[in-house]
């Protein structure tokens, strides 16, 4: 198998390491890749004690993506159990249905312990979940020991080590329960954060809608009051613009654009009359006055020249 894959690939390195760590079965779980496919594993887990699955041995498949461990695997149960559908990708916080909660530090062993820890929990309508009665689950637990996988040839009777009553078994059970609790809490935190963000966004949209729904008379009175405070000189007030009829099919972005266009200041002549003269108007007035003075001075010089010429002619005739 090693010659068929690129040993420099992070996914291949990781899966080779995990295959060596999980080579020996335990009394609670076992998993190994297929001989011809490193990215498909078959696993076997024992049902958690003190539950409806006590005494059951369940078999399934784990399909890993090429981006593993950056992306989560897909988990498929092959043994009827009453908690997960057979032959369908189940929806867990460690499966491909929830890549947002997956952590690259998790491994296939983490997935096996999570499956054991999630089996006694309620499905709550998740994809691939079932809610059989306790009697049906106990019957399926007894029947699961006779299952034999055609893909890998594993028989449930001898694939796991015999169950022991000791610290090792109880430690594995506690680890599975604690892992399932932590994963469930992480998923709840992520979903609650997403819900809060969506509620804030909806509240923002509803606030914009409430501004659109204000009565026309109230909007006109508000505009008149604000303009009177800014223009105490008594200039004629501009007539408030009637808003266009609200279109319920408009998107939030279109509604915001419409509001911004309505809030732009008016540029009517009445409003411009109340504005103070600009500075460049004074500069133009000074230039015009200077031109007039120079013109008058030039005219005076011309008249003086004409007067002196006429006076010289009069003296010459005398």
From Swiss-Prot:
Topological domain ranges for the Cytoplasmic compartment: 1-282
Membrane-topology annotation of the record: Single-pass type IV membrane protein
Described function: Catalyzes the covalent attachment of ubiquitin to other proteins. Functions in the selective degradation of misfolded membrane proteins from the endoplasmic reticulum (ERAD) and is essential for cells to recover from ER stress. Plays a role in MAPKAPK2-dependent translational control of TNF-alpha synthesis. Also acts as a platform for perinuclear positioning of the endosomal system by mediating ubiquitination of SQSTM1 through interaction with the E3 ubiquitin-protein ligase RNF26. Plays a role in male fecundity through the interaction with the E3 ubiquitin-protein ligase RNF133.
GO molecular function: ATP binding; ubiquitin conjugating enzyme activity; ubiquitin protein ligase binding
Keyword Ribonucleoprotein included in the entry's annotation: no
Pathway(s) of this molecule: Protein modification; protein ubiquitination
Biological source species: Mus musculus
Keywords of this entry: ATP-binding, Endoplasmic reticulum, Membrane, Nucleotide-binding, Phosphoprotein, Transferase, Transmembrane, Transmembrane helix, Ubl conjugation, Ubl conjugation pathway
SMART domains recorded: UBCc
Low complexity compositional bias, start-end: 249-269
Annotated ranges, domain UBC core: 10-168
Protein name: Ubiquitin-conjugating enzyme E2 J1
Annotated region (Disordered), positions in chain: 215-283
Biased composition (Polar residues): 215-233
GO CC aspect terms: Hrd1p ubiquitin ligase complex
Disruption phenotype: Deletion mice have reduced viability and fail to thrive early after birth. Specific components of the ER dislocation machinery are up-regulated. In addition, males are sterile due to a defect in late spermatogenesis.
PTM: Phosphorylated at Ser-184 in a cytosolic stress-dependent manner by MAP kinase p38 MAPKAPK2. Phosphorylated UBE2J1 is rapidly ubiquitinated and subsequently degraded by the proteasome.
Family membership noted in the UniProt record: Belongs to the ubiquitin-conjugating enzyme family.
């Amino acid at each position: 198998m090693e010659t068929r894959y690129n040993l420099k690939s992070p996914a291949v390195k990781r899966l080779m390491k995990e295959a060596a760590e999980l080579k020996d079965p335990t009394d609670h779980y076992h998993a190994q890749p297929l001989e011809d496919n490193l990215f498909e594993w078959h696993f076997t887990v024992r049902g958690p004690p003190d539950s409806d699955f006590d005494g059951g041995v369940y078999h399934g498949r784990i399909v890993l993506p090429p981006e593993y461990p950056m992306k989560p695997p897909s988990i498929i149960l092959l043994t009827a159990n009453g908690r997960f559908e057979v032959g369908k990708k189940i929806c867990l916080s460690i499966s491909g249905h929830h890549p947002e909660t997956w952590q690259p530090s998790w491994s296939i062993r983490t997935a096996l312990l999570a499956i054991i820890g999630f089996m006694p929990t309620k499905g709550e309508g998740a994809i691939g979940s079932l809610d059989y009665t306790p009697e049906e689950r106990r019957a399926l637990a007894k029947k699961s020991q006779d299952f034999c996988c055609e893909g890998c040839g594993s028989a449930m009777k001898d694939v796991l080590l015999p169950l022991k009553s000791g610290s090792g078994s109880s430690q594995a059970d506690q680890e599975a329960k604690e892992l399932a609790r932590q994963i469930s809490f992480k998923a709840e935190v992520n979903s609650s954060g997403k819900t809060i963000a969506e509620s804030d966004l909806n509240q923002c949209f509803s606030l914009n809608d409430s501004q659109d729904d204000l009565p026309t008379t109230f909007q006109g009175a508000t505009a008149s009051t604000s303009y009177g405070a800014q223009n105490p000189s008594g200039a004629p007030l501009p007539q408030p613009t009637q808003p266009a009829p609200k279109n319920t099919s408009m998107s939030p972005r279109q509604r915001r654009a419409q509001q911004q266009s309505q809030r732009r200041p008016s540029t009517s002549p009445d409003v411009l009359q109340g504005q103070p003269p600009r500075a460049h108007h004074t500069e133009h007035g000074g230039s015009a006055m200077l031109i007039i003075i120079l013109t008058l001075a030039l005219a005076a010089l011309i008249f003086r020249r004409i007067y002196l010429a006429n006076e010289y002619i009069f003296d010459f005739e005398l």
